[in-house]
Amino acid sequence: MTVYVTGDIHGGLDMQKLRDWDLGDSLTSDDYLIVAGDFGFPWDFSAEECADIAWLESRPYTALFVDGNHERFDHWAERPMELWHGGLTQRLSDTSPIRRLTRGEVFE
């Protein structure tokens, strides 16, 4: 297992840095990418945004994020909490591997 950390992708605004990340294609389902603030998905559910989300969900690694100030908190307020690796998380959708890591939780 390997953990990589980035920040501030602001939804589709800065997704290109992940698309250009050569190492990302060589990772496995045991690896994690943590976005430390301003993940920014979902925002408006546009066709372009949905394509970006689908691309991120198709990656071999698991995308996780800690929220920043550029999040759709109204969306996340509607998502159920789930226990995951010892801490509370929320998934982007019921079937999405993308998880919001709840502030103040400790993950194993």
Per-segment meaning from a language model:
Residues 6, 12-107:
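Core catalytic region of metal-dependent phosphoesterases/phosphodiesterases
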